[in-house]
A protein has these predicted regions:
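Nucleotide phosphate-binding/pyrophosphate-handling subdomain across enzymes
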Residues: 1-46
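Cofactor-binding loop segments of dinucleotide-utilizing enzymes, especially the Rossmann-like FAD-
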Residues: 26-30, 50-52, 101
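Generic beta-sheet signal
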Residues: 22-24, 95-99
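C-terminal helical cap/extension that packs against the catalytic core
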Residues: 35-96
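Short glycine-/acidic-enriched loop or helix-start segments at secondary-structure transitions
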Residues: 7-8, 34-36, 59-60, 108-111
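Alpha-helix N-cap/helix-start capping motif
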Residues: 1-4, 81, 103
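Active-site catalytic pocket residues across diverse enzymes, especially alpha/beta-hydrolases
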Residues: 14, 67, 91, 113-117
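Glycine/aspartate-rich loop-and-adjacent alpha/beta segment that forms the canonical ThDP
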Residues: 102-118
């Protein structure tokens, strides 16, 4: 989900996801309605605010400030990879980890996962 229409559908699925804790790695780009999307996000999740590598990315600090204004709690990360790794480090087996907000966030994660680590 990278726009309000997509999040109306997706947020219902995330909210009803059976799990111990929801972890959401989230970032958006500057041509999307971030406030309307954040109104749809679950309040009971832990957020990992991030930004994609595109020049269109909203800085993760700004995303975090918007999140806080909507009652969403999380920490700021300077890359999708660092946010994802933090979520995995905290998550336990019955938790749910979601990565999204923008297709660019997902793209950065896929690039990270495809890069061999030394």
């Amino acid at each position: 989900g990278h726009n309000v229409g997509g999040w109306k559908y997706l947020s219902k699925q995330i909210i009803h996801q059976e799990c111990h804790q929801k972890h959401i790695v989230f970032g958006m780009v500057d041509d999307k309605d971030i406030d309307s999307v954040m109104e749809l996000l679950p309040k009971d999740a832990i957020y990992y605010w991030s930004q994609a590598t595109t020049h269109r990315a909203i800085p993760s600090q700004v995303v975090a400030q918007k999140g806080l204004a909507h009652g969403l709690v999380g920490r700021v990360y300077d890359s999708v990879e660092s946010a994802y790794m933090a979520a995995l480090a905290i998550a336990v087996p019955n938790d749910f980890v979601f990565i999204g907000g923008s297709s660019y966030i997902v793209s950065d994660l896929l690039a990270c996962l495809a890069t061999p680590k030394e």
